[in-house]
């Protein structure tokens, strides 16, 4: 089993080292568009990306000072990274291109703006949220009528916990260009503020605004399915995940969504099959963590423990393998904290969670993570402090409310804790399955 697990998990790192070496050694060469090792999306989508890349490369061979082509290549790398999940390679490739375009190399401020806009997207993707916000703010100062830069501001302000600012930025984005990108952000903000029905409505608009089969449309469709899943509507969630798999076969986020549906239904063998297919399509730490949860629920504690420990080892290896001169590094503090917590090592988890929280002290997700870690350490005073903060936006996420209820009950506020757990069950009757409560020694309501 360990050999099989490691084979799956090695996909987490196999695509993250090639470019990091070549880029640092040959900064003047154009990064390659790597050959995909598997089918990912429609052939015409791949063909468009390849053609755009080749045209830009040929243009730069004729005129190395054609700065527009560096913007084009950066856009290509960002798109390819999103589709393939090879974020380390393509984020650094894109940054290398954008470094060619700044106010010192061109008097064209529109190109500078485009460079800032793309750079902010890369920094967000690599979880460098503070830098992403500063970059997006510079971009907005150059062009206040571009919807994309306000999308970056929404994302960065959400991650930094500046939720009121994010709402203002989203309103501005919607006024400029109501489309899939703006509708999906409106949905996420409504979810943050506890408006689950409104979040579903906005995400439906996002799906309707997209072209079926394209990655961004299927991302929106699977996020809509997630909203249904998290509010207890398994049938609607499954229908959307399956629809996404028809429009975009083997789409990893639809596969992992089906794994969650089957897990909730306690069909653990089916869940395991979907989770493994998702990992083979695209390795994500969250996917492998779900795999471990499924093993745990199947009663195979040894496989669950083994898988969780492998996640830690591979995340650490990824950090160790990252060159010191990498143009942009992936901040994995949250991922490491979650991995250690899932592996039953809350003391180590706390160190990484504190690093994450120090960067964004008002972010509700960062507060939720550290609150749960403190609870696992039996530090109920600090757990309650951060439970208060994680509820600041009045979220109606069932798992979040249930965790808060457990914390408040343990801290001595039984009435408040019980009410929150009841509220969580009213939102999602399947919250026990979401949190694996059957196999964990946590408070439950029967």
Task: Describe the predicted segments one by one.
Residues 64, 106, 110, 144, ...:
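Short coil turns that delineate tetratricopeptide repeat
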Residues 20-114, 134, 168, 419, ...:
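N-terminal leader/linker segments that initiate helical-solenoid repeat arrays
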Residues 59, 100-101, 138-139, 172-173, ...:
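Canonical positions in the second alpha-helix
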Residues 75, 79-82, 121, 155, ...:
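Residue-level recognition of tetratricopeptide repeat
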Residues 72, 114, 118, 152, ...:
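Canonical tetratricopeptide repeat
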Residues 68, 75, 114, 148, ...:
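Start-of-helix register in tetratricopeptide repeats
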């Amino acid at each position: 089993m360990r050999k099989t697990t490691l084979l799956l998990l090695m996909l987490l790192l196999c695509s993250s080292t090639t470019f990091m070496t070549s880029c640092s050694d040959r900064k003047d060469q154009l990064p390659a568009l790597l050959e995909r090792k598997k089918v990912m999306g429609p052939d015409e989508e791949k063909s468009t990306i390849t053609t755009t890349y080749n045209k830009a490369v040929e243009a730069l061979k004729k005129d190395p000072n054609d700065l527009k082509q560096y913007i084009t290549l950066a856009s290509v790398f960002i798109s390819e990274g999103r589709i393939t999940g090879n974020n380390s390679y393509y984020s650094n490739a894109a940054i290398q291109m954008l470094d060619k375009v700044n106010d010192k190399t061109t008097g064209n401020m529109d190109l500078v703006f485009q460079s800032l806009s793309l750079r902010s997207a890369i920094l967000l993707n690599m979880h460098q949220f503070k830098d992403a916000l500063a970059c997006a703010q510079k971009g907005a100062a150059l062009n206040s009528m571009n919807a994309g830069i306000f999308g970056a501001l929404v994302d960065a302000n959400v991650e930094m916990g500046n939720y009121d600012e994010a709402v203002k930025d989203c309103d501005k984005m919607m006024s400029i260009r109501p489309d899939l990108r703006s509708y999906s952000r409106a949905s996420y903000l409504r979810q943050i503020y506890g408006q689950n029905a409104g979040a579903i409505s906005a995400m439906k608009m996002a799906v309707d605004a997209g072209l079926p089969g394209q990655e961004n449309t299927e991302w929106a469709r699977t996020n809509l399915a997630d909203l249904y899943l998290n509010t207890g509507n398994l049938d609607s969630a499954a229908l959307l995940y399956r629809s996404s798999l028809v429009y975009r076969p083997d789409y990893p986020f639809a596969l992992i969504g089906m794994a969650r549906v089957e897990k909730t239904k306690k069909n653990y063998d089916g869940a395991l099959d979907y989770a493994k297919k998702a990992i083979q399509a695209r390795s994500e730490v969250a996917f492998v963590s779900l795999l471990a949860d499924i093993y745990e629920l199947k009663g195979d504690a040894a496989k669950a423990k083994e898988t969780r420990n492998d996640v830690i080892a591979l995340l650490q290896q990824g950090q160790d393998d990252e060159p010191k001169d990498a143009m942009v590094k992936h901040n994995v503090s949250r991922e490491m904290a979650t991995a250690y917590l899932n592996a039953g090592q809350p003391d180590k988890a706390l160190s990484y969670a504190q690093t994450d929280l120090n960067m964004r002290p008002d972010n509700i997700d960062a507060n939720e993570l550290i609150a749960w870690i403190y609870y696992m350490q039996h530090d109920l005073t600090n757990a309650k402090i951060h439970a208060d903060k994680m509820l600041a936006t009045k979220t109606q996420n069932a798992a979040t409310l249930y965790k808060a209820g457990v914390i408040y009950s343990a801290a001595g506020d039984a009435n408040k804790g019980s009410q929150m757990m009841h509220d969580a069950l009213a939102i999602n009757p399947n919250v026990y399955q979401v949190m694996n409560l059957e196999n964990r020694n946590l408070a439950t309501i029967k």
